[in-house]
């Protein structure tokens, strides 16, 4: 079931030029990324039911913020790990009570759900992470790289799903979207060069204005 962390965060930086409200779903994640800032509170911990917000409670709190924020950003964990029906139902209700923009943050492993939400115009933008040059790596030969950065044992399909999601976001062509990479200290500069080159080629292909950000690595606070 879709549940939410009760601490909403006001942010000026996640969506440049907009005052946004960041809301984390407490629904787990299918990655265990190096230096994840949400791991201790939202992923590694077992959810405590009485501390979580239901979709109804989240919508009630969000409705009181309408007009105060330009956008709401839904993150996780991995927000799209919930069922397509549950996501659609929830975001339809968000549209009814919140007049600002709706952004979803994702690791890209659920392109089908992402495509569905974009086609229904239930979200205005997507912030997607391209953590590795998935178009170049081999899940078997580069298993140690995957383990070190995303903490998961991938398959070819896993990599293809992420690339499909990145393609969707760039083709959707919203200035509210972002493709992002963290400059992980474990990786050589060549990794980041290859990712940036891949994104630029897609942007040229679709004449897309979606920005790409190579962000510095900030270790989680202890």
Which stretches of residues belong to each language-model region?
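Residue-level preference for short coil/turn positions at secondary-structure junctions
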Residues: 16-18, 29, 67-68, 98, ...
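Short, conserved beta-strand segments within well-ordered enzyme catalytic domains
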Residues: 22-24, 71-75, 103
């Amino acid at each position: 079931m879709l549940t939410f962390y009760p601490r909403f965060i006001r942010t000026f930086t996640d969506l440049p030029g907009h005052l946004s409200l960041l809301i984390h779903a407490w629904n787990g994640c299918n990655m265990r990324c190096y230096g994840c800032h949400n791991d201790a509170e939202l992923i590694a911990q077992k959810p405590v039911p009485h501390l979580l917000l239901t979709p109804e409670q989240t919508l009630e709190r969000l409705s009181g913020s309408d007009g105060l924020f330009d956008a709401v950003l839904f993150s996780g964990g991995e927000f799209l790990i919930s069922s397509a029906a549950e996501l659609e139902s929830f975001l339809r209700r968000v549209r009814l009570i919140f007049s600002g923009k709706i952004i979803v943050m994702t690791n890209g492993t659920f392109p089908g759900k992402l495509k569905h939400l974009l086609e229904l115009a239930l979200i205005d933008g997507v912030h997607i992470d391209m953590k590795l040059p998935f178009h170049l790596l081999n899940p078997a030969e580069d298993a140690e790289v995957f383990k070190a950065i995303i903490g998961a044992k991938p398959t070819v399909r896993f990599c293809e799903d992420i690339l499909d999601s990145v393609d969707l976001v760039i083709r959707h062509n919203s200035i509210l979207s972002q493709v992002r990479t963290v400059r992980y200290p474990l990786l050589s500069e060549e990794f980041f060069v290859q990712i940036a080159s891949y994104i630029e080629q897609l942007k040229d292909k679709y004449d897309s204005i979606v920005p790409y950000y190579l962000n510095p690595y900030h270790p989680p606070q202890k």
